[in-house]
C-alpha cells in the first residue's frame, strides 16, 4: 500500500482500492465516505486534466474534511498514519454503542438519583429535554453534566449522540447564576424634588417619595453643600416651621422644599447678597446684573430684557415699536449698544434733556462704531432716530447711517429730497423721509398735511411716523399703521427683510429712469421706499395697474392690485378706502405731474416686465380714459369684451368686471376718472397676459382683452367654445354648449382643433365675431374649412390632450389603433366623395327628420345622429372632418350642442354602447351618413377591426348577442307589442309608421328611414342595394341580405351618400311599406344574431330597429369582429328562423304566391346563411370588400330593386311582422336557437367560407343573394 508515501493524491481512483483493506465495519464505513469524495474529485480532475498538483492537494485537504466529527475518548490522533485505523476502531465502537440502549443514572437538582434508559443515538440536547420533561424540569434553566466511569467530566456537543460518549452518570443541575449578571432589581420608585436654597438657587434631587425626610436630608444637604447638622428643611422660604422629618414626601404631599442653613455664617452670607442686590437695584450696575441674569434665563431669546426695560425711558415718548424692532437684531448688538450707557446719569428720573444728551452721545459713539458693525449703526440709529427730532444735523447723520444698511441708493440726494419733502409738507419729519413722489403728487393738490389725503399725505406720515415725536404720531392714523408705514417707508433699518429686498429691486429698477425724474430720481434712488410708495400709490393709482403690475407682475398680484385699487400691496393696513383716496389724489397728482408721471410710469414699467408693452402707451391712453371718464371706459371695456368674447358669457364677464372696477374705484369723481384708466390698464394687462398665451391678438387687440382675469379666462376657454359656437344656431346655445363642454371636458376636442384654425377668425381681427354673434349661417362650413386641415395635421400626431378622447376616437367596429396619416388621406378622399353623395341625400332629408335627429339624443346613435343631421343641414364638407366615428362623435358633441342638441354631448358618450337600447331611433338617412363615414374611415383603415371598445358590448358571440337583443326586447316588451301592430301598419302605411311609432325602436328606425327613403329612395336603392337584398330574400334571407349589406358598409364608404348600410333600412323604407319595417327588423336581427331575423319580428326586431340603424354598420361590423363565433353551416337557429319564415310565408299566401314559395326553405336557409355570412364577411373583409362591396351592393341593389317589388317584400316582411306579432313565440325560437350556441357560431363560420369569397371584388354572397332574389322574383 502507498500509505508510507506522503500521499499527495490519496483520493485518486487507483489508490481507492488499496485504501480499503478488509477491516472493521467502522473502517468500511469511513472508506465508503472517503471513496465517494475521491470519486467526485477524480471526476473533477478528469475534467480538468491540466490542473496543477497543488490544486489536487488542496482537493485532498477538502476530502479529509468529513472525518468523524466526535472527539473519541481514548483516541490519540498523533501520526499521519494512525488516523485511519484509530478512527475506524472508534467508529466501530461508537456504532455499537449507538445501536443499543444505554442505562444512565440521573442526578436531579436535589441530589435525587434516578435511573433511566436512553437509546444511544439520542443527541445530548434531546437528552436534556427528554430528562427535564420526564422529571418536570425546565430545560431552559438546567444544564447536563456528563460523568464518565472515572468520575471525569465529559465534554460534548449538543448534537453528539449519547452512545458515542462513555457516560456513567448524568447530572441535571440548574444553570449557575454566578456566571451571569444578577437579575435586575426592580428599581425603587423615585420622584424629582426641587430643593430651593439660598433664596435664589435651586437644585433637583431624585429621591424616594416613601422614604422619611430624615433619610433624605443627607442627600439634600450634599446636593446643596450644606452641613446636615445646620440644615433645616422648610416648605418654602416664608414658612418658619420646619417640616416633620419623620414623614415622607408623599405624606407631606410635597415635591418642592426649601433647605435653609441655620448657621450664623450662612445667615450673614445670605443677608449680604440681599443687601447688595437691593443696592444694586438702585444703582446703574444693577441693570447690567439683572440683565445678565435674565439673559442667562432667557438666553434663547434674541432680544434681551435689558433693552426692553432700559429703553422705555427714552422710547416711550417715541414710537414704541422701534426698540422692539431693534431687539430683533443679533444678541451681540445689544451688548454693543450698552457700552455708551455707563456715562449716563445713574438716576432713571433724569430730565429728558439729559436723555437726549445721552442719545447724542450714543449717536456719536454709534457713528464711531459704524465701522465695527452695520448692525451697531442700525441699533444706534434706531435709538437716535427716536431722539433725533431736535436737531436736523443729527437727523442727517442718523439718516445717513440709517440708509447705509438699506439697499444701495443715493443717500445724500435722498436726504435732501426728504428734507425738502418734509418742508413742503410742513411735516416735522424727523427722518426727513417724505417721499418726493408723494410731495409731487400731494403738493400740487395742496395736500401738504397728512389729513389732506390718505394717499401721499398718509404715505408721508407713514414714512415719517418712525422719526416723528409722539405728538405727530398721535396725529397719524395710529401706531400700528405707523409701524406699518415705517416698515413700508424703509426709513428705519428695522423694516422687514422682504421690504428691503423689494426696495432694492425698486431702487435698482428706478436707477435708470431716475435721471428723467428730476426730483423723484433721488427719492427713488435713495429711498426705494419712496419709489415703492410712488409706484404703489401715485403711479399705481394713476395707472390703476401699476400696483398689481409693478410689484407682482403676476395675475395674483394684479388681482390684488385690482382689489385694492391702487392700494400698495405693502400697505394692507392702510385700508381700501385710504388707498382709493390715494388713488384719486394720485390721479390728480398724476395729471399735475404730467411728464413726471410718465417717468414714474416708465419706472414702473421697469419694475413690471409684463405691463411694459402697454404701460408705455398707457399714459396717453390713461389720460384719454381719465378725460373720457367712466363712460368711455365702459364703452371701451364693452368693445374689448365684445372683441374678445363673441359669446355673451364673455361679454357679461367683461362688462361685469369693468363695472365692478368702476364701482370699486368710484367712491369719488376723481376715483372715477382714475378708475377708467385703472380698468383700462387692467384690461390691457389681462389682454397682454392672455395674448402671449394665445399669440393671436393684434397690437391693437390689447385693449380688447377682458378687464377681469376671469373674463380673460372665459375668453381663452371660449376660444374653443366660440369655434364650436360658430356652428351653433344661437349665441345662447353656443354659450351653454361651451359651458357644457367645459364642464364635461368634451369641448377640448373642438377647442383643440378649432381654435388652431379659427383663432384667426375669432381673434385675428378686432372686429367682433359675427359668426359667434349668431351669424353662423354655415357653421359646418366654417368648421370644415379648418377641420379637414386639422385632420390631416392631427392624425399623424394626435395632441396629448386628445390622444385618448378626442384626437383618436375609435371608430365603429374598429380596434383602438391610432389613425395613420395615409388612412386619414384616404378617409378624406372617401369623405369628399361621400360628402358629395351625402349632400344630395341630405338635401332630400325632410325637416322633420332633422328634428327627429335632434331628438335622437337619447338614442345610442345620438352623437352620430346629430352629427349626421348637421351634415345634412350643413354642406357635406362636414363629413370630411367626420371621417372617423370618434371625430364624428366629438363633432357631434361640440357641433350638435351648438345646433341645439346640447343635450347630446353629455349623452353622447353612451351612444355606441346604448345603440340597441335607445328608445329614439335616428333617421336612417342620418344614421347611414354617420355609419358610412365611419365605415369608410374603416375602409381607409384596413388594419382597423371592429373591435373598438365602444362596440365591445356588441362583440359578443352572435348567439350571445342575440340573447342580449332578445332580453332587451323582453324588457322592452311593451314596446315590441306596439311595434308588431306598428309593423303591420307600417307595412300598410310605411311612411306613417315612423311618425306613429316613433317610440318603438324598430318602428322609429323605420319611420326615420321612411321619410328619408321617400326622398333619398333613389340614392338608397341605388347605393343601399344592401337594403334591397333584405327585401328580396325571404325574411330570413332578408335578414341575410341585410346582413350582407353590412358588408356593403364599405359601400357607404364609397357611397358618400348617407350610410348606404343604413339605407338598407331605408331601402326597406324605399320599399315603402314592405321593407321599411320588416327589413329593418330582420336586419337588426341579422345584425345582432344573424339568425335572429325571424325572431326579429317581435322585440328582437324592435331592438335591432334602434340598433339596426346603429347596427346597420356598427353591429354588422361588430359582428364581423367576433369571427371566432362565425359558423359555416345553417345553425339550428338559422333553420328555426327559416322554418318560421317559411311558416309565415305559408301563412301569408301573398308572400307564397309572390315567390316566397319560389325560394324553398332550403333556399331560404342557404340564403339566410349566406346573407348572414355576408355580413360577417363584410365585416371581416370589410377592408377588401368595402371597395368591392359598393359594386356588389350596387349589383345586389339592382337585382334587389326588382326584388324590391313592394308586394313581395311587403309580404315577406308582413310574415315577419306576423312573427313579431307573436313576440313570445319568436322569442322562444330565438332563445332556443341561441341556447344551442352553435347557431350563431355556425352561421358566422358558414359566412366566412361561403360568402366571404369575393369574385372580382364582388362577394359570392351578394351575387348569390341577387340571384336568389331574381329566382324568388
From Swiss-Prot:
A motif (KKRRAP 1) lies at residues 335-340. Residues 1-25, 61-85, 290-579, 619-807, 860-923, 958-1070, 1090-1109, 1148-1208, 1252-1273 are annotated as: Disordered. Keywords: Phosphoprotein. The modification Phosphoserine is found at residues 248, 266, 300, 317, 366, 373-374, 384, 396, 518, 521, 541, 546, 551, 554, 645, 666, 770, 869, 896-897, 993, 999, 1028, 1092, 1214-1215, 1266. Residues 354-374, 631-643, 653-662 have a biased composition (Basic and acidic residues). Pfam families: Cobl (PF09469). Residues 314-330, 383-397, 485-495, 702-750, 763-779, 860-876, 894-904, 993-1002, 1187-1200 have a biased composition (Polar residues). GO terms for molecular function: actin monomer binding. A motif (KKRRAP 2) lies at residues 400-405. Detected in embryonic first branchial arc, branchial clefts and limb buds. Residues 1226-1246 form the WH2 domain. The modification Phosphothreonine is found at residues 183, 304, 328. Residues 496-505 have a biased composition (Acidic residues). InterPro entries: COBL-like (IPR039895), Cordon-bleu_ubiquitin_domain (IPR019025). This is Cordon-bleu protein-like 1. It comes from Mus musculus.
Amino acid at each position: 500500500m502507498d500509505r508510507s508515501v506522503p500521499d499527495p493524491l490519496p483520493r485518486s481512483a487507483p489508490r481507492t482500492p488499496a485504501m480499503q483493506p478488509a477491516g472493521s465495519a467502522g473502517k468500511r464505513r469511513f472508506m465508503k465516505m472517503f471513496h465517494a469524495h475521491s470519486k467526485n474529485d477524480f471526476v473533477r480532475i478528469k475534467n480538468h486534466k491540466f490542473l496543477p498538483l497543488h490544486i489536487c492537494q488542496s482537493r485532498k485537504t477538502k476530502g479529509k474534511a468529513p472525518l468523524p466529527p466526535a472527539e473519541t475518548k481514548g483516541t490519540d490522533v498523533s501520526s499521519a498514519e494512525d488516523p485511519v485505523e484509530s478512527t475506524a476502531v472508534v467508529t466501530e465502537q461508537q456504532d455499537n454503542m449507538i445501536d443499543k440502549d444505554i442505562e444512565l443514572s440521573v442526578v436531579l437538582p436535589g441530589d435525587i438519583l434516578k435511573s433511566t434508559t436512553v437509546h444511544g443515538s439520542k443527541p445530548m440536547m434531546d437528552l436534556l429535554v427528554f430528562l427535564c420533561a420526564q422529571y418536570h424540569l425546565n430545560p431552559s434553566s438546567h444544564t447536563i453534566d456528563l460523568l464518565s466511569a472515572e468520575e471525569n467530566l465529559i465534554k460534548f456537543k449538543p448534537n453528539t449522540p449519547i452512545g458515542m460518549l462513555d457516560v456513567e452518570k448524568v447530572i441535571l443541575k440548574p444553570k449557575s447564576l454566578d456566571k451571569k449578571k444578577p437579575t435586575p432589581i426592580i428599581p425603587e420608585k423615585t420622584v424629582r424634588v426641587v430643593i430651593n436654597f439660598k433664596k435664589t438657587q435651586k437644585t433637583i434631587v431624585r429621591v424616594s417619595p416613601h422614604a422619611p425626610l430624615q433619610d433624605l436630608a443627607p442627600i439634600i444637604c450634599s446636593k446643596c453643600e450644606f452641613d446636615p447638622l445646620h440644615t433645616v428643611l422648610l416648605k418654602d422660604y416664608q414658612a418658619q416651621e420646619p417640616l416633620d422629618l419623620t414623614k415622607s414626601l408623599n405624606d407631606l404631599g410635597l415635591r418642592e422644599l426649601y433647605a435653609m442653613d441655620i448657621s450664623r455664617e450662612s445667615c450673614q452670607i445670605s443677608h449680604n447678597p440681599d443687601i447688595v442686590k437691593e443696592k444694586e437695584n438702585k444703582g446703574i450696575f444693577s441693570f447690567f446684573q439683572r440683565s445678565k441674569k435674565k439673559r442667562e434665563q432667557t438666553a434663547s431669546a434674541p432680544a434681551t430684557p435689558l433693552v426692553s426695560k432700559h429703553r422705555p425711558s427714552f422710547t416711550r415718548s417715541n414710537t414704541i415699536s422701534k426698540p422692539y424692532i431693534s431687539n430683533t437684531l443679533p444678541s451681540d448688538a445689544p451688548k454693543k449698544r450698552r457700552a455708551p450707557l455707563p456715562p449716563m446719569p445713574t438716576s432713571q428720573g433724569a430730565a429728558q434733556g439729559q436723555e437726549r444728551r445721552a442719545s447724542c452721545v450714543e449717536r456719536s459713539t454709534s457713528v464711531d462704531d459704524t465701522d465695527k458693525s452695520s448692525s451697531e449703526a442700525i441699533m444706534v440709529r434706531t435709538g437716535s432716530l427716536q431722539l433725533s427730532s431736535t436737531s436736523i444735523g443729527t437727523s442727517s447723520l442718523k439718516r445717513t447711517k440709517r440708509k447705509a444698511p438699506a439697499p444701495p441708493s443715493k443717500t445724500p440726494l435722498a436726504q435732501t429730497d426728504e428734507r425738502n419733502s418734509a418742508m413742503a409738507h410742513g411735516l416735522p419729519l424727523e427722518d426727513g423721509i417724505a417721499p418726493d413722489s408723494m410731495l409731487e403728487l400731494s403738493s400740487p393738490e395742496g395736500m401738504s398735511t397728512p389729513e389732506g389725503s390718505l394717499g401721499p399725505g398718509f404715505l408721508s406720515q407713514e414714512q415719517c411716523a418712525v422719526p416723528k415725536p409722539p405728538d405727530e404720531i398721535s396725529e397719524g392714523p395710529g401706531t400700528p399703521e405707523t409701524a406699518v408705514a415705517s416698515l413700508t417707508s424703509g426709513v428705519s433699518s428695522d423694516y422687514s427683510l422682504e421690504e428691503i429686498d423689494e426696495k432694492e429691486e425698486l431702487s435698482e429698477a428706478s436707477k435708470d429712469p431716475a435721471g428723467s425724474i428730476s426730483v423723484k430720481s433721488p427719492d427713488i434712488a435713495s429711498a426705494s421706499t419712496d419709489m415703492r410708495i410712488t409706484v404703489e400709490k401715485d403711479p399705481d393709482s394713476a395707472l390703476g395697474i401699476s400696483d398689481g403690475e409693478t410689484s407682482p407682475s403676476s395675475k395674483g398680484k394684479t388681482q390684488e392690485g385690482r382689489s385694492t385699487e391702487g392700494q400698495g400691496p405693502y400697505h394692507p393696513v392702510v385700508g381700501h378706502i385710504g388707498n382709493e383716496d390715494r388713488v384719486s389724489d394720485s390721479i390728480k397728482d398724476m395729471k399735475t405731474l404730467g411728464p413726471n408721471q410718465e417717468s414714474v410710469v416708465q419706472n414702473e414699467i421697469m419694475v413690471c416686465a409684463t405691463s411694459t408693452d402697454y404701460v408705455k402707451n398707457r399714459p396717453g391712453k390713461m389720460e384719454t380714459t381719465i378725460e373720457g371718464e367712466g363712460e368711455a371706459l365702459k364703452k371701451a371695456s364693452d368693445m374689448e369684451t365684445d372683441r374678445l368674447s363673441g359669446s355673451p358669457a364673455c361679454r357679461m364677464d367683461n362688462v361685469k368686471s369693468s363695472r365692478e372696477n368702476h364701482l370699486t374705484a368710484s367712491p369719488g369723481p376723481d376715483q372715477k376718472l382714475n378708475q377708467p384708466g385703472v380698468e383700462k390698464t387692467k384690461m390691457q394687462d389681462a389682454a397682454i397676459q392672455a395674448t402671449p398665451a394665445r399669440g393671436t391678438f393684434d397690437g391693437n387687440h390689447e385693449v380688447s382683452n377682458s378687464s377681469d382675469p376671469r373674463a380673460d379666462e372665459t375668453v381663452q376657454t371660449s376660444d374653443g367654445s366660440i369655434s364650436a359656437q360658430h356652428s351653433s344656431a344661437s349665441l345662447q346655445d353656443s354659450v351653454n354648449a361651451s359651458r357644457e363642454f367645459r364642464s364635461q371636458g368634451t369641448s377640448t376636442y373642438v377647442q383643440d382643433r378649432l381654435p388652431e384654425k379659427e383663432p384667426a377668425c375669432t381673434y385675428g381681427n378686432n372686429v367682433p365675431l359675427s359668426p359667434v354673434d349668431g351669424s353662423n349661417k354655415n357653421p359646418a362650413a366654417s368648421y370644415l374649412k379648418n377641420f379637414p386641415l386639422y385632420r390631416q395635421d392631427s392624425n399623424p400626431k394626435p395632441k396629448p390632450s386628445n390622444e385618448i378622447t378626442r384626437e383618436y376616437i375609435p371608430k365603429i367596429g374598429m380596434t383602438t389603433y391610432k389613425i395613420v396619416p395615409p388612412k386619414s388621406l384616404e378617409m378624406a378622399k372617401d369623405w369628399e366623395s361621400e360628402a358629395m353623395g351625402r349632400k344630395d341625400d341630405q338635401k332630400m332629408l325632410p325637416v322633420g327628420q332633422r328634428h327627429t335627429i335632434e331628438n335622437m339624443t337619447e338614442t345610442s346613435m345620438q352623437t352620430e345622429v346629430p352629427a349626421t343631421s348637421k351634415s345634412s343641414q350643413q354642406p357635406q364638407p362636414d363629413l370630411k372632418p367626420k371621417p372617423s366615428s370618434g371625430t364624428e362623435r366629438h363633432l357631434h358633441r361640440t357641433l350638435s350642442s351648438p345646433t341645439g342638441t346640447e343635450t347630446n354631448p353629455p349623452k353622447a358618450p353612451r351612444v355606441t354602447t346604448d345603440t340597441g337600447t335607445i328608445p329614439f331611433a335616428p333617421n336612417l338617412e342620418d344614421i347611414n351618413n354617420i355609419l358610412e363615414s365611419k365605415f369608410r374611415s374603416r375602409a381607409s383603415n384596413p388594419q382597423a377591426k371592429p373591435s373598438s371598445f365602444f362596440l365591445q358590448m356588441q362583440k359578443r358571440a352572435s348567439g350571445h348577442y342575440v340573447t342580449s337583443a332578445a332580453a332587451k326586447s323582453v324588457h322592452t316588451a311593451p314596446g315590441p307589442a306596439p311595434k308588431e301592430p306598428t309593423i303591420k301598419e307600417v307595412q300598410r302605411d310605411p311612411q306613417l309608421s315612423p311618425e306613429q311609432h316613433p317610440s318603438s325602436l324598430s318602428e322609429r328606425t323605420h319611420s326615420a328611414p321612411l321619410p328619408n327613403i321617400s326622398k333619398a329612395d333613389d340614392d338608397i336603392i341605388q347605393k343601399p342595394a344592401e337594403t334591397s337584398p333584405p327585401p328580396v330574400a325571404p325574411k330570413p334571407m332578408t335578414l341575410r341580405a341585410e346582413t350582407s349589406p353590412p358588408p356593403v358598409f364599405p359601400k357607404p364608404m364609397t357611397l358618400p351618400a348617407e350610410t348606404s348600410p343604413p339605407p338598407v333600412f331605408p331601402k326597406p323604407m324605399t320599399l315603402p311599406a314592405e321593407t321599411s319595417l320588416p327589413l329593418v327588423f330582420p336586419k337588426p336581427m341579422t345584425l345582432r344574431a344573424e339568425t335572429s331575423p325571424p325572431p326579429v319580428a317581435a322585440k328582437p326586431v324592435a331592438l335591432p330597429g334602434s340598433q339596426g340603424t346603429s347596427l346597420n354598420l356598427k353591429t354588422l361590423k361588430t359582428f364581423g369582429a367576433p369571427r371566432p363565433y362565425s359558423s359555416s353551416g345553417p345553425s339550428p337557429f338559422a333553420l328555426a328562423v327559416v322554418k318560421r319564415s317559411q311558416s309565415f310565408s305559408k301563412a301569408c299566401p301573398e308572400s307564397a304566391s309572390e315567390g316566397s314559395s319560389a325560394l324553398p326553405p332550403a333556399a331560404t336557409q342557404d340564403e339566410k346563411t349566406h346573407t348572414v355570412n355576408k355580413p360577417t364577411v363584410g365585416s371581416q373583409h370589410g377592408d377588401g370588400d368595402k371597395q368591392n362591396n359598393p359594386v356588389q351592393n350596387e349589383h345586389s341593389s339592382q337585382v334587389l330593386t326588382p326584388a324590391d317589388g313592394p308586394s313581395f317584400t311587403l309580404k315577406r316582411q308582413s310574415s315577419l311582422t306576423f312573427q313579431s306579432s307573436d313576440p313570445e313565440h319568436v322569442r322562444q325560437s330565438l332563445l332556443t336557437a341561441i341556447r344551442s350556441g352553435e347557431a350563431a357560431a355556425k352561421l358566422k363560420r358558414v359566412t366566412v367560407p361561403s360568402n366571404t369569397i369575393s369574385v372580382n371584388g364582388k362577394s359570392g354572397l351578394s351575387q348569390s343573394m341577387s340571384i336568389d332574389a331574381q329566382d324568388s322574383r
